[in-house]
């Protein structure tokens, strides 16, 4: 633990998450596989492909790059995170099934500027501890929820500067339930940016999320499997920002 904490403290500096007050941005996700869709990328050098995707996302002006580090279902690892953090200048977030503050410190040691924490994986007290661990290193935290019960549970961290992600994928069936974004949007704290997760595949999806008040969308499969990931990223961001402009003008 002492050595890991020392590595985290001496790692590449955290890249601050800088979001405009009333805008729409994308978290571009790098992953090689998913439980819902199987293997997404077949290449001889997965690490290199991870870096290539990250650079395309960065060039398309994403706010954050999310990197899967879970090995069995997503074919990820911490090396992918570290390689991405070295290659880009935007914040990089570790996405995994994190259940211990040590894993947050691991992420920082590998160069992450943020972490995703799944609300229902831990008790509220542990979620708060992991959140505070990340914030203590200057990292941002995206707390992921699936329903109102999850939202109630994470009220212990509403006084921290976190992002709240609403995942529309049903964990049992793995099917996307887009209506969940609309159901939960009115209940999200006004002072915390909301993130639409899973199911944002088209400009129409991005526009719909933005109209509901979500400040970001986390998009993975639609970008990874696109023939032109950078251009797809740009279209999604532009659609969300158009929706914001229309809402502001009305």
Where do the language-model regions lie?
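A short alpha/beta connector and helix-capping loop motif
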Residues: 103-122, 127, 133
């Amino acid at each position: 633990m002492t050595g890991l904490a020392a590595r985290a403290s001496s790692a590449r500096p955290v890249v601050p998450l800088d979001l405009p007050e009333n805008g729409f941005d994308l978290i571009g996700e790098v992953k090689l596989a998913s439980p819902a869709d199987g293997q997404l990328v077949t290449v001889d050098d997965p690490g290199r492909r991870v870096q290539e995707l990250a650079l395309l996302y960065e060039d398309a002006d994403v706010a954050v790059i999310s990197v899967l580090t879970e090995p069995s279902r997503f074919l990820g690892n911490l090396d992918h995170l570290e390689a991405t953090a070295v290659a880009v200048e935007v914040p990089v977030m570790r996405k995994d099934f994190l259940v211990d503050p040590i894993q947050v410190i691991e992420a920082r040691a590998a160069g992450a500027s943020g972490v995703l924490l799944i609300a229902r994986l831990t008790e509220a007290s542990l979620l708060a501890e992991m959140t505070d661990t990340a914030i203590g290193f200057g990292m941002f935290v995206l707390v992921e929820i699936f329903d109102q019960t999850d939202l109630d549970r994470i009220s212990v961290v509403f006084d921290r500067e976190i992002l709240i992600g609403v995942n529309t994928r049903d964990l049992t069936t793995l099917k996307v339930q887009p209506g969940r974004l609309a159901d939960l949007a009115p209940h999200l704290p006004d002072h915390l940016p909301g993130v639409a997760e899973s199911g944002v595949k088209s400009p129409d999806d991005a526009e719909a999320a933005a109209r509901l008040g979500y400040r970001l969308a986390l998009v993975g499969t639609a970008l990874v499997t696109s023939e032109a990931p950078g251009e797809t990223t740009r279209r999604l961001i532009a659609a969300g920002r158009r929706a914001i402009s229309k809402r502001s003008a009305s």
